[in-house]
Amino acid sequence: MAITQERKNQLISEFKTHESDTGSPEVQIAILTDSINNLNEHLRTHKKDHHSRRGLLKMVGKRRNLLTYLRNKDVTRYRELINKLGLRR
């Protein structure tokens, strides 16, 4: 199921770095992580949905690139985000 606008606004308010922040790496990674988790649940029940699986792989790759960017830019923000989201990196 797609991420709702209310859930997206909740993630933005939780991970924003300043008042009008909607596009910082932290916000983008949080939204992608939520979408990835939702898509994982979908794929557990619909194992043959290869079209959605490709979308999942694209989202995981995009999140990985954003995490690498954030790690190179500011390690402390990267570590805080990883702990907050519960990612394994």
UniProtKB/Swiss-Prot annotation:
One of the primary rRNA binding proteins, it binds directly to 16S rRNA where it helps nucleate assembly of the platform of the 30S subunit by binding and bridging several RNA helices of the 16S rRNA. GO terms for cellular component: cytosolic small ribosomal subunit. Part of the 30S ribosomal subunit. Forms a bridge to the 50S subunit in the 70S ribosome, contacting the 23S rRNA. Belongs to the universal ribosomal protein uS15 family. It comes from Bacillus velezensis (strain DSM 23117 / BGSC 10A6 / LMG 26770 / FZB42). It comes from the Bacteria. Residues 1-21 have a biased composition (Basic and acidic residues). GO terms for molecular function: rRNA binding; structural constituent of ribosome. Residues 1-23 are annotated as: Disordered. This is Small ribosomal subunit protein uS15. InterPro entries: Ribosomal_uS15, Ribosomal_uS15_bac-type, uS15_NS1_RNA-bd_sf. Keywords: Ribonucleoprotein, Ribosomal protein, RNA-binding, rRNA-binding. The gene is rpsO. It holds the Pfam family Ribosomal_S15. One of its GO terms (biological process) is translation. Coiled coil: none annotated.
